[in-house]
């Protein structure tokens, strides 16, 4: 510390030497020229390459982002289209099912009407046959009754007996 104080007292540091300034500046300029010739070019080219690399990475990132957005939009469009197509298919299937149900219902109603009409026709035919048979039987019985009446002279008791006999015969012939 003592030596520092002596140098300060002598004015060595506060009075710069012009020769020392010249040689220091000259050395600095020489080092600067040497560095410019040897190191400055590679440093700048390395910085430029690094800047190009960073810009290229940024460009690739933007391109990838744009492609991803395009793919996302395409996928959304495809999904919307698929949803619309699915809705259309479901709607068409419901329409076909409703039409098929209506057709089957109409066919079933037609078939039941035919069966009912056929059954009514059969019933009507059976009714006519039964009435024909009944008329024939009644006519036969009336003829037989008339024959009996004609053969004998009837009083009131005999008439009742003949009618009762005819009723019994009709009941027996039906069974």
UniProtKB/Swiss-Prot annotation:
F(1)F(0) ATP synthase produces ATP from ADP in the presence of a proton or sodium gradient. F-type ATPases consist of two structural domains, F(1) containing the extramembraneous catalytic core and F(0) containing the membrane proton channel, linked together by a central stalk and a peripheral stalk. During catalysis, ATP synthesis in the catalytic domain of F(1) is coupled via a rotary mechanism of the central stalk subunits to proton translocation. Component of the F(0) channel, it forms part of the peripheral stalk, linking F(1) to F(0). HAMAP family: ATP_synth_b_bprime. Signal peptide: none annotated. It comes from Chlorobaculum tepidum (strain ATCC 49652 / DSM 12025 / NBRC 103806 / TLS) (Chlorobium tepidum). The gene is atpF. The chain crosses the membrane at residues 14-34. GO terms for molecular function: proton-transporting ATP synthase activity, rotational mechanism; proton-transporting ATPase activity, rotational mechanism. Keywords: ATP synthesis, Cell inner membrane, Cell membrane, CF(0), Hydrogen ion transport, Ion transport, Membrane, Transmembrane, Transmembrane helix, Transport. The keyword Transmembrane helix applies. This is ATP synthase subunit b. It is found in: Cell inner membrane. It comes from the Bacteria. GO terms for cellular component: plasma membrane; proton-transporting ATP synthase complex. It is a single-pass membrane protein. Belongs to the ATPase B chain family. F-type ATPases have 2 components, F(1) - the catalytic core - and F(0) - the membrane proton channel. F(1) has five subunits: alpha(3), beta(3), gamma(1), delta(1), epsilon(1). F(0) has four main subunits: a(1), b(2) and c(10-14). The alpha and beta chains form an alternating ring which encloses part of the gamma chain. F(1) is attached to F(0) by a central stalk formed by the gamma and epsilon chains, while a peripheral stalk is formed by the delta and b chains.
């Amino acid at each position: 510390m003592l030596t520092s104080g002596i140098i300060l007292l002598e004015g060595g540091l506060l009075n710069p030497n012009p020769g020392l300034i010249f040689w220091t500046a000259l050395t600095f300029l020489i080092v600067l020229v040497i560095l410019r010739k040897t190191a400055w070019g590679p440093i700048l080219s390395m910085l430029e390459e690094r800047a190009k690399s960073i810009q290229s990475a940024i460009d690739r990132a933007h391109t990838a982002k744009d492609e991803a957005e395009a793919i996302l939009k395409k996928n959304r469009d495809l999904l919307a289209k698929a949803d619309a197509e699915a809705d259309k298919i479901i709607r068409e299937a419901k329409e076909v099912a409703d039409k098929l149900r209506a057709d089957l219902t109409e066919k079933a109603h037609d078939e039941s009407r035919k069966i009912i009409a056929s059954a009514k026709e059969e019933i009507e035919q059976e009714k006519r046959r039964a009435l024909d048979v009944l008329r024939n039987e009644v006519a036969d019985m009336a003829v037989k009754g008339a024959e009996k009446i004609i053969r004998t002279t009837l009083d009131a008791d005999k008439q009742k007996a003949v009618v009762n006999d005819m009723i019994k015969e009709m009941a027996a012939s039906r069974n």
